[in-house]
UniProtKB/Swiss-Prot annotation:
Family membership: Belongs to the UPF0145 family.
UniProt-listed InterPro entries: UPF0145_dom_sf, UPF0145_YbjQ-like
Pfam families: YbjQ_1
Entry-linked PANTHER family: UPF0145 PROTEIN YBJQ
Protein name: UPF0145 protein Spro_1658
Length: 107
């Protein structure tokens, strides 16, 4: 499955638009508590543990997006947008959302 943030895929022709697809993942409050309590993990202004959790959430969201596209018979998703939102009481959770257009492409 081809995944792209661009509206087209170089070298491919979009033959059919199958529909909008999305994927979501939510990081619970514990990651934030661990993040802020574990400031010692920050090296050079970055937290390896926090980045690992964000990467995991992104992978989950992309997997959902790809599964939806396959269900629609698509072999690619174009125009992918990745968003991060804080949700929940006191913005204690982080939601990763990906969306795009499922398409069928050919060379």
């Amino acid at each position: 499955m081809q995944l792209s943030t661009t509206p087209t895929l170089e070298g491919f022709t979009i033959t059919e638009y199958c529909g909008v697809v999305t994927g979501e993942a939510i990081l619970g409050a514990n990651i934030f508590r661990d993040f802020f309590a574990g400031v010692r993990d920050i090296v050079g202004g970055r937290s390896g543990a926090y980045e690992k959790e964000l990467r995991k959430a992104r992978l989950i969201a992309f997997k959902e997006l790809e599964e939806q596209a396959k269900e629609l018979g698509a072999n690619a998703v174009v125009g992918i947008d990745i968003d991060y939102e804080t949700v929940g009481k006191d913005s204690s959770m982080l939601m990763v959302t990906v969306s795009g257009t499922a398409v069928k492409v050919s060379r």
